[in-house]
Amino acid sequence: MEYETVIGLEVHCQLKTNTKVWCSCDADYDNKEPNTAVCPICTGQPGALPKLNEKVLDYAIKAALALGCEINRESYFDRKNYFYPDSPKNYQITQFFKPYAENGVLKITTNSGKEASVGIERIQIEEDTAKSIHTASETLLNYNRASVPLIEIISKPEIKNAEEAYAYLNTLKDRLKYTKVSDVSMELGSLRCDANVSVRKKGETKLGTRTETKNLNSFKAVVKAIEYETNRQIEVLENGGRVVQETRLWDEENAVTKPMRSKEEAMDYRYFPEPDLPAIIITESRLSNVKDEMPEFADEKAKRFINEYKLNEMEAATLSSEQELAEYYEEVVKVSDDARLAANWVLTEILRVLKEKNISIEEFSVEPQNIGKLIKLIKANTISSKIAKDVFEILLSENKDPEIIVKEKGLVQITDNSEIEKIVEQVLAENPQSVEDYKAGKSNALKYLMGQSMRLSKGKANPKMINEMILAKLKG
């Protein structure tokens, strides 16, 4: 019997504001002593009243627009009631009945090249919980994270397999990263994902019983958990069993999901309107201001790079994959006035260094203006491409004007015809066999003589002039 998988993803994304969502406590919870970035509001003390951080609302709107959502001009906060040590109030302020954003869509392309669209059901503003640190004998709680602003992005159950889930998460992460509203790092905990998985017989329209899997600390873990849970549920059904609606925990070490608790229904949380916060009213002016701040996203940028800079699809996709890398590239283009050479340098030399040093483009020490100037020196025949690579290596430790480096190191390209002639004559005199080989029709001999000439000039001779001079002498 054939089955199909139905997947919905719930993504929690921390917003990168300076202060928490309901109070003025510092939101940079990891760089503080435990339980020091707290106040009566974020620890739920009696009588303490929350107030919405306006920056949270702007960031939330920006994220929703990036994901193609409709913005509700009026929305409300609600209380989700439950008891757990990481929630000091014994409830979470969220948006259940009327979220601020709904009905989004994300276009994705899988690694195998398949295109699809995944609907986003809703996005809601809520607060994070305290951070639990589990040891062998106890659980420690750091309330610095309590009330750090979150948005929860809930997809529609339209993802068909683990490959699509991976593409959805990567696309979502890339678009949110471009808005700069979040670090979107699963490693740092600013992006977290729960996977809802169910299976049904192929052709059926009714959804199967779903499970929710937590503790997914990477996109690869999400993929593995979905694949495991799909196979587990199919096996249960094939053996005549019944899938239990429950929350399961991903065990990374053993690559399995394990039961955690029975899955709660909405009624279990006794949602009711938050009495201490007014409705969110999003004005036309506010929405317009946020729209004006929206960036050009990676897919849009890639298309422009292809049209404007005549790059191929792979080059454009790589250069636009990160906003900072795209900005670096365009600054090199601006200074060098050569999009082709700029792309070559960024895609080869610069990405090589980033990979070797395991750093981001923001941490790269060489300013884009200096790469642009280096390219201009090549175009002006001041230095050869080979010497340019030597200058680049110097730039990695001495980030200064490449023109100064070239002058200080005596690296200016030899373009004087008489000097070129002397170099070529010496090489021909020292390599009579190669001269005979060339005259006998062996084309590789010319490459050898070129190489010897460049070596004699220590890479400083103009390659084109060397080549022309060798040919002239051999045919003369």
Which role does the model predict for each range below?
Residues 361-372, 376, 382-455:
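Strongly charged, low-complexity linkers/loops
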Residues 280-281, 316, 328-330, 341-342, ...:
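Extended hydrophobic-aromatic, low-complexity segments
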Residues 16, 231, 326, 330, ...:
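Amphipathic alpha-helical core segments of compact helical bundles
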Residues 1-296, 313, 334-338, 348-351:
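Basic, nucleic-acid-interacting segments
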Residues 189-201, 306-330, 339-357, 369-371, ...:
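Core structural elements
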